[in-house]
């Protein structure tokens, strides 16, 4: 990959809408994907954390890959969340995503079995080699996986041709700086947290894998473009305006708040599959107040 921003600047980690019966609402998936790429998103991650991948079957995921790819219709990149703590399972899902014509795969650090750093390296290397034509975005999120993938491991993996990016959700600016300084120029770092996008971009990140872009994608895009064109004051202004929303969308475990927010604005994305549960009335009231202040509802 020769282009640092191959996946774009603002990538939405898309929710998976459900019907009242708890089935995937494929018709609404199509409409939401279309909306996102016309309202600030350069790409979509489908079946990531925000998409409730742990409670989706692989068959549901493959159907979602296909529908989102068709809905986006070349107007942005579609990245499949095919990560697993089983290397063979991740390979099978990634190969299926490649067959369906997706633009990349998101590979999360294996959770629960807690491999050492060498195991992480071998895991991601094996997946990348099994699907050499599909770009890979690594996903480091210690708060969910139980361990941090070190900069040294990420730097080593960045030498693999089709490992082109990392979603950094460690919240560690020093780690981001180290990755940026020791990876190839065309290796892209994305913030995994909306509220850290601006700080991480000053450390070399190119954009964000966003949750808030469901609601304010154009504003986030505007913030990034302001920074890129040298208007730091404007970028800071936008960031501070959106900051309460960025934090409000993490008042409970993601994607509980963003689903509540989307329901508030009329998207009717439904509830969540257990063990996730609905946002409490008190937290929903607080989130609604933030959204009202931004004229979102």
Swiss-Prot record:
Site positions for Part of a proton relay during catalysis: 49, 112
Keyword Lyase found: yes
Binding-site residues, pyruvate: 50, 209
One record GO biological process: lysine biosynthetic process via diaminopimelate
An example molecular function term from Gene Ontology annotations: 4-hydroxy-tetrahydrodipicolinate synthase activity
Cited SMART domains: DHDPS
Subcellular location: Cytoplasm
UniProt-listed CDD domains: DHDPS
GO cellular component: cytosol
Substrates-to-products reaction catalysed: L-aspartate 4-semialdehyde + pyruvate = (2S,4S)-4-hydroxy-2,3,4,5-tetrahydrodipicolinate + H2O + H(+)
E.C. designation(s): 4.3.3.7
Gene3D superfamilies given in the database record: Aldolase class I
Domain of life according to the entry: Bacteria
Annotated active site: 139, 167
UniProt entry keywords in alphabetical sequence: Amino-acid biosynthesis, Cytoplasm, Diaminopimelate biosynthesis, Lyase, Lysine biosynthesis, Schiff base
Keyword flag Transmembrane helix: no
Metabolic or biological pathway: Amino-acid biosynthesis; L-lysine biosynthesis via DAP pathway; (S)-tetrahydrodipicolinate from L-aspartate: step 3/4
Subunit structure as annotated in this protein's UniProt entry: Homotetramer; dimer of dimers.
Family: Belongs to the DapA family.
Function: Catalyzes the condensation of (S)-aspartate-beta-semialdehyde [(S)-ASA] and pyruvate to 4-hydroxy-tetrahydrodipicolinate (HTPA).
This protein's name: 4-hydroxy-tetrahydrodipicolinate synthase
Organism: Microcystis aeruginosa (strain NIES-843 / IAM M-2473)
Source organism phylogeny: Bacteria, Bacillati, Cyanobacteriota, Cyanophyceae, Oscillatoriophycideae
